Amino acid sequence: MKGKYLLGILVILGALGYMVFGGLGRNLVYFLTPSEYLQDQARYQNRPVRLGGLVKPGTVQYDKDRLELRFVLTDGVAEVPVFHKGTPPGMFKEGQGVVVEGRFQEGVFQGTNLLVKHSETYQPPKEGWTPEEVRKLIEEAQ
């Protein structure tokens, strides 16, 4: 009788372990820099990754009608072309740090999610500030 209970518990634990760890490997999303990706392109081809770096100045092209954003992401050493379908975040600009989630396909990173890195410091407007002063403060923070 004890043997059947022990065997049942082991089967249940084995099944739970397989579901947890088996699914974990398929759902991992790696964070890479352009240099790390270019060192091992085959490993990450058609796999979901997060690519982090800076938007290279002079490379941003945005088609407002089609909602297509193209730019080059760099880590100062390597560069990767990025395509993102959708409206860019409000703080998106050249030279800005970004993280793009997506997949590499045919040499271009196809972004599905675009996040802008920004300072974690928050300074609320002081009483009596004019809208122009608040706008200037926001622009300086970016």
UniProtKB/Swiss-Prot annotation:
Keyword Cell division: no
Subcellular location, record wording: Cell inner membrane
GO cellular component terms attached to this protein's record: plasma membrane
Gene Ontology MF: a single term: heme binding
Keywords: Cell inner membrane, Cell membrane, Cytochrome c-type biogenesis, Heme, Iron, Membrane, Metal-binding, Signal-anchor, Transmembrane, Transmembrane helix
Sequence ranges on the Periplasmic membrane side: 24-142
Residue numbers on the Cytoplasmic membrane side: 1-2
Pfam entry (one): CcmE
Binding-site residues for heme, renumbered to this chain: 118, 122
Keyword S-adenosyl-L-methionine among UniProt keywords: no
BP terms from Gene Ontology: cytochrome complex assembly
Membrane-protein topology: Single-pass type II membrane protein
InterPro entries according to UniProt: CcmE, CcmE-like_sf, NA-bd_OB-fold
Bilayer-spanning residue ranges: 3-23
Main location: membrane
Family per record: Belongs to the CcmE/CycJ family.
Database matches in PANTHER family: CYTOCHROME C-TYPE BIOGENESIS PROTEIN CCME HOMOLOG, MITOCHONDRIAL
Protein name (database record): Cytochrome c-type biogenesis protein CcmE
Organism the protein comes from: Thermus thermophilus (strain ATCC 27634 / DSM 579 / HB8)
